[in-house]
Design a protein with these regions (language model features):
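N-terminal, active-site-proximal structural segment of metallo-dependent hydrolase catalytic domains
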Residues: 22-118, 129-135, 139-141, 318-326, ...
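Bacterial Sec-dependent N-terminal signal peptides
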Residues: 1-25
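Structured beta-strand-rich core segments of catalytic domains in phosphoester-bond hydrolases
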Residues: 100, 106-192
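Active-site-proximal beta-strand/loop segments in catalytic clefts of secreted hydrolases
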Residues: 39-42, 104-106, 130-134, 146-147, ...
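Extracytoplasmic, non-cytosolic globular domains
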Residues: 130, 174-269
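Metal-dependent phosphoester-hydrolase catalytic domains
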Residues: 22-28, 219-229, 237-356
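Extracytoplasmic/secreted cell-surface and envelope-processing proteins
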Residues: 46-48, 110-113, 137-140, 196-199, ...
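Sec-exported extracytoplasmic/periplasmic mature domains
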Residues: 86-90, 108-121, 149, 215-225, ...
């Protein structure tokens, strides 16, 4: 029996304050579950400067830099990241946690190799899909998967370009197609352009990123109208911002969806005041998952993998315990001082469910 398959009685463990209202299940039937996650690893850099690249941030992450980024700090960061990832989505229903996990703010494939080899993740046997991005900060997106549950059939990297600024570059968007316990799915991992220069002034870049993501989705659903496509990433905008709601045609309530819409379960969480990162004492929810309608079981039959519930993973150990930023993410550096935290973002994840 798959480790995802458990009796309905375990479902009570899936609920907490950071849970969006779940779909309705029949207590007389049994179901199997799968977890999909996303985590911004906040500048997971090694200590080595690549002489063949000209990336802005890599000079900051060396022993001689102002950050004094040495092997001890690097391996400590890996330990922290592995600890978090090992716990994302873990429950009695899903003891193996995230079957697939999108990540961002990684320097290269080498740091992912080091991460998945960590003793805290060895039981998951995570495999990697990664492409180098042209981003001038030197950071990429990546995709981790447990081969016991997910099989990759294809992958492709898409570059975001701005016609009026040919020298500008950002992170590529990563499309991974495969089978989750035998069912075909597509995952798009994103890290949209930041708000540097001002939210309003930079919004056109995120709209362009949303247009690229939506074009990938549309190409997949044109080929297969029932394609299960999940877009996940740090979008650097909230669920209600135009780049997400309008460009992606996303809707936060299933009952409000019409033809052509996508479902964004993070919108309801955001409206409850829940976030994944803080800025000037307020919450943002930049880390999101947006799904095509084929993930919604309108008749609650759950004959195929369908959306069940979404969460922000914000356990207490991931938060500042005191001070000005109490309750907000416990990050690696604060005002240039190394504080040995985790990330400036909380991870997000959701559960998919289907009837046995």
């Amino acid at each position: 029996m798959s480790l995802f398959k458990y009796a309905f009685s375990t479902l009570l463990l899936l609920f907490c304050f950071t849970t969006l209202k779940a779909q309705t299940l029949n207590p007389d039937k049994s179901y199997e579950f799968a977890c999909v996650g996303f985590y911004n690893l906040e500048n997971l850099f090694d200590t080595i400067v690549d002489p063949d690249t000209n990336k802005i941030l890599q000079e900051d992450f060396t022993p001689k830099s102002s950050k004094q980024w040495d092997s001890k700090k690097y391996y400590g960061k890996l330990d922290n990241m592995a600890e978090v990832i090992s716990k994302i989505g873990v429950s009695k229903s899903v003891p193996q946690g995230a079957a697939v996990l999108g990540v961002c703010e990684i320097e290269n494939k080498s740091v992912l190799d080091d991460l998945v080899a960590h003793e805290k993740l060895q039981d998951k046997n995570y495999q990697i899909v990664h492409y180098d991005s042209p981003d001038k900060r030197g950071i990429d997106v990546g995709f981790l998967y447990q081969p016991k549950y997910f099989t990759v059939t294809s992958s492709k990297s898409f570059t975001l370009k701005l016609p009026d600024n040919p020298n500008w570059a950002t992170r590529d968007q990563l499309l991974v197609t495969g089978e989750l316990n035998g069912q075909k799915m597509h995952f798009i991992v994103c890290h949209w352009p930041s708000r540097r220069g001002g939210q309003k002034e930079s919004s056109y870049k995120r709209v362009a990123a949303g247009e690229l993501a939506k074009s990938i989705v549309d190409s997949l659903t044109k080929e297969d109208p029932l394609a299960k496509v999940l877009v996940m990433g740090d979008l650097n905008d909230d669920p209600v911002d135009p780049s997400v709601r309008e460009t992606m045609n996303s809707v936060g309530e299933i009952e409000n969806m019409v033809t052509g819409d996508m479902f964004n379960p993070m919108e309801s969480l955001f409206k409850l005041g829940i976030g994944t990162l803080g800025y000037k004492g307020a919450w943002n929810l930049f880390d999101q998952m947006v799904l095509t309608p084929s993930f919604i079981s309108l008749d609650n039959s759950f004959s195929t993998y369908s959306y069940f519930t979404a969460k922000v993973f914000n356990n207490s150990f991931l938060k500042n315990s005191s001070g000005k930023f109490e309750g907000f993410p416990f990050r690696t550096y604060s005002y240039g001082k190394f504080i040995n935290g985790y990330s400036d973002h909380f991870p997000v994840y959701l559960y998919l469910v289907k009837q046995k």
